[in-house]
Amino acid sequence: MANLGEIVQKVRSKNAGPFWLTVDIFCGTPHAYAHVIAKLSSATVAKAFGMNTQDIKRFDIADLHVVKFSLPRPHVQGSTLDPDMHGASWAALLAELPLEN
């Protein structure tokens, strides 16, 4: 079983405003894209981040071989409780997620 980061070209996360984060998965190839959309569910992402599935928005962008997840920030960006103002560390968590072959 390989980690998501070993299968795809790049996993990136960033701000999507003060209340949302976005995680972009650049698959690189049609094969990797097909594998990711088949094996990585919104429920799996929600569980990895300790969130409810219905709070996760998923966008499959076939022409670019990209899967994008938008999720609510646990704390408002820049608040004293926000440990990652730029939202960059979320990608590392998802990249380490094991995916079935």
Per-segment meaning from a language model:
Residues 1-101:
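Long, contiguous binding/interaction regions
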